[in-house]
Amino acid sequence: MSNRLIHLVLLAHCLMLLSSLQARAAPSPKMLVETIDLSSLAISPDGLNVAFRQDQASVERNAFAAGWYVQPLDGAHPPVRVADGVEPVRMIYGLVATAPPKWSPDSRWIYYRAMVGGEIQVWRAAADGSRAEQVTHDAADVESIALSLDGRQLSYTVGPSRETIERSEQEEADRGIRITPNVPLGEEVFRPGVVNGRLADERYTDKGWMEQAGLLAGQPKRRIVLDLASGATHEARPEDLPAFSQDLPIEGLKASSTPAGGNDFRVRSGLDGSVAFVERGASTSTLRVARDPTKSSFIACPAAACKDAVLRSLAWRPDRDDVVFTGADRSSGRQSLYDWNITSGSVKLITSEAGVIGGGRGLMTGESCAVAAQSAVCVMASADVPPHLETVDFATGQRHLLYEPNTTLIAARGPRAQFLTWTDDHGRLFTGQYFPAAGGKPGQRAPLFINYYSCDGYLRGGLGDEWPLASLAGAGIASLCIQARPNDPSGQIASYETALSGVGAAVDLLASRGLVDPSRVGMGGLSFGSEAAQWVMMRSNRLAAVSVATPTLTPTYYLTQSLQGAGFKANLLKEWGLGSPSETPEAWKRLSPAFNIDKLQTPILMQFAEQEYFAAWDYFVPLSESSTPVELYVFPHEPHLQIEPRHQLAANDRNLDWFRFWLQDYVDPDPEKAEQYHRWETMKARWVAARHQAGQDGSRSREHGGGGAPQP
């Protein structure tokens, strides 16, 4: 082949690649679902390597793959995969548990919990990637691990055996499951959800609001000590514990706080055993150090950064009297890394990031950077930049990219996010991440989608990852993630009103700039974000389409959950002002969509977890018999978040279709979706006819021509 012909072939390939990249205005929902997450960082004792875990969903396999990697801190070599075939262990609401591995003192091995073959055991992997092997073979799932200071012994905790749990579940089922306050009603009573990789019974715990765990999770735990050389085990004795002092739970600091879904906000120094912790008051947080955790004498961090910012993580510098911590400034959307020297009291700003330092998303509060003597390794991410590893030099603040796993997402980034601030009529400050619509013409106003809740980290789909913000923007629908303001102390209704005010002010701001069409605004969310969207839907005419992932409060919800007793009822009264429907009828009429069917006239898509959807019966059924367009999808065995990759993709794809249909009049020509659009067109025709008959404007303004959506 001549050189000229080779050049022509290469040019053709380059043009095809360029065309493909141009056609892909933004990441697809599938690409967002399959984002690679990084977590659980730990630096080796010799300070030369960092170990971390990489998690990724696979839609094809409908599973998550977790692998452990080790990489030199100097970046001289790419990371080496030292262990794979691991399934993520999940916690409350379906969140993935993160925990740094334990390095052996000689820096040759990492020890970690792994779920393999339906069992959670301790495994270890050689740092050079030569082998990975199972360490424990316990009949029960391992819940926590500790490595002795000399690396010769392993300590781990377990509850009842897997066989005991499964036998107890089956025995209860065989004789009939007695309904007690800790049995969740409204879902299957026998093995409704996934616990440690299998369908299992669940019960309410007394640890938090609506928190569930496995059937025998409240049984006493046992601590086992394993001799790594001989394999011999015994129940831990008091004289064994000093060898594991660095990794054992910290007792005696009742003022400390553990954030939901994250690591403990109590960390022990390897230098002298001092403990850094966060003391939370009614409206402030303070970083403190206890030289002796058994006494009430504390050293408070004197700098404003220790009090004004939202503290996200803590770590000690090796062999130094310094605490490295991360603080978030909501008004600027930035997080900063600081060094507090306890002896001198000085606090130094190391670096600042327009996103998250120490994690790829905002769910995992407390996931810290891995700290070496002179530098830290952190997972960095921002609204439009997916998770990656960077090193940060403590002396200079200089940062260097260590590992970029999400190259495909980087190549298909699409519209860049813009950080916005605005105030409502009450002067309250709001912040958000705005993705401008792609493909618009000058002077053309785009439709707008709004998600209201948490906007930390890489925004693949808002909290819950179900609304593909970048994909919507790439399709011509501007997207705005609004960071929810702190909960109003007077209760949830005040917080909903704040959300309504902030959403309205944001729409007015973007409309005044000629960027969006205020008559074509959609909104969606999970949990509080879902409640906010339904409140805006009921209390305003701002929205043209809605999609929610969590039901809100209804009489059915109250009836099924009130069996939990006084604690549930007290919290409902405190936060929402709700007693039973007969005790507080006016509050229910104001709050619940079940009593506001006439105000639910906006097309609404419901995509709920099976464990929660029952609460929507009170308003889904009446809506189904009305002219309001509504569809309800239920994802089997899901808790609060959608866990299965195929469920995540289905929710994302359907949300994209839903908002393109109602905000752009767009119908995907994919023949496999023909039946979906036939239903939606039928619902739309009925809805428009009913609105015309009622003397309303039955169609949203389309004078701006579909918001500049690129047409295939």
What residues fall within each predicted segment?
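Beta-strand C-termini and the immediately following turn/loop, strongest in propeller blades
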Residues: 51-58, 99-105, 110-117, 155-161, ...
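Structural motif
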Residues: 61-68, 118-123, 163-170, 220-224, ...
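Cap/lid segment of the alpha/beta-hydrolase catalytic domain
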Residues: 403-519, 526
